[in-house]
Amino acid sequence: MDFGAYFAGFVDGEGCFTVSFSPRSKLLIGWEVRPSFSVSQNADRSEVLVVMQQYFGCGSIRPDRSDRTLKYEVRRLDDLVERIIPFFEAKPLLSSKQRDFERFAEVCKLVHNQAHRTQSGLREIVSLAMSMNASGKRKFGTEAIFPTGAEVIVSAISNDGRKRSSDPHEWRNDLSAVSTRGSAKLNWP
C-alpha cells in the first residue's frame, strides 16, 4: 500500500497547518512564532495517527480536550522543515488546503532562517499566517501583535529598545521630554 498517497488524502480532509503566536517578554521581538502540523481523529480511529507518526518518524499523539479527539502533532521546526514539508511538496494536496500548506511552508522556512527575529520578518510571517485557515480562530491577531495605538507611538518615540508597559499611566516617565502638542512625524517600522 502507498501510505504516502493515503496520508496526503487523509490530511487533505482531516489535517491542519497552523501558525500560532504567543507573547514572550524575554524574546527580542516579544513574540514566539509556533508553526505546527496536526491531524485529529476520534479515539476509536487512532490507529491511523499511530501509523502516521511511525511513517514520519516524528511528532507526538496527545488528547485534545477541546473536542475530545486525539491529535497527531508535529511542532519541532527541524521535523517540519526536513520531513513534513518535503513530503507535501512531493505529494501535493488537492483541496484549497494546498494554498495553506504553501504559506505554512514559507513561514517555516522564514523561521528556520531566523526571519522571525526581525520586525520586518515577523510582519511577513504574521501576514502569511493570517491569510491561512480563514475559518479558524486566533487568540492573537495582527492588531495584538502590531498595535497601532499609543503603544506603538511610545515605542517609536523612545526607540532605545527597552520594553514599555502597555499601561498609559506608566508612560509619564518615558515621555517626560516629549511634547504631546503639535504634529510629529513618526517612521513606522
Range-by-range predicted roles:
Residues 1-189:
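Sequence-level preference for short, compositionally simple segments enriched
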